Amino acid sequence: MTHPPSRAILAAAAIVMMLNACTPAPTEPTSPAPEETSMPIQQEGAPYPADLDHLDDILTLGKTTLPEGATTITITPATKFAESYPGGWGYVITYHADPQPIRNHIDTYTDLKGENLESYPDSTTFLHIKDIDFSSIHHPVITGFGKVQLVVERPLGRCWLLIRGAPR
């Protein structure tokens, strides 16, 4: 023998259905990862949008390249530099590379010796590089050449290339 549902059960079920209808369903993150974005980010005054389609052009501005085999490449605008320097613009290029190509890159573009990267003391002055979050970077070495600041994390793998400019 079955009994019809009581009014209390029906009311509770109706309330649960209404609450579920008012609660947004979980969604995927609304912001795509920088390498997935289809809309380039154009910083005022910058010669190119901060996107992978313009990577070679951006690297040419700094008269540099990335280490051979670099992967997981992202480009973001250097907005903190732009805020602190009237008319300034810049790009932060983040990437991963194997140790030997990083050493070769250091040898080619800086005064440091790539073979000695592990023996250099950790860089501790980050005041001039506000567009890179150093809180999760272990044992950084910072070096510069021209318009470029290069941050290398040890053990070798993660790197950041900051290219900045301004009107003349």
Language-model segments: which ranges?
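Bacterial N-terminal signal peptides that target proteins for export
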Residues: M1-L10
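Juxtamembrane and targeting peptides
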Residues: V16, T27-E28
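Extracytoplasmic low-complexity, Pro/Thr/Ser/Ala/Gly-rich segments
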Residues: P29-G87, Y91
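Terminal, regulation- and interaction-focused segments at domain boundaries
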Residues: K80-T108
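C-terminal motif of bacterial Sec signal peptides marking the signal peptidase cleavage site
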Residues: M18-A21
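A short, structured loop/turn motif at beta-sheet edges
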Residues: T64-G69, D98-I102, P155-L156
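Extracytosolic low-complexity repeat regions of secreted or lipid-anchored proteins
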Residues: V92, I102-A166
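Bacterial signal peptide processing site
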Residues: T23-A25
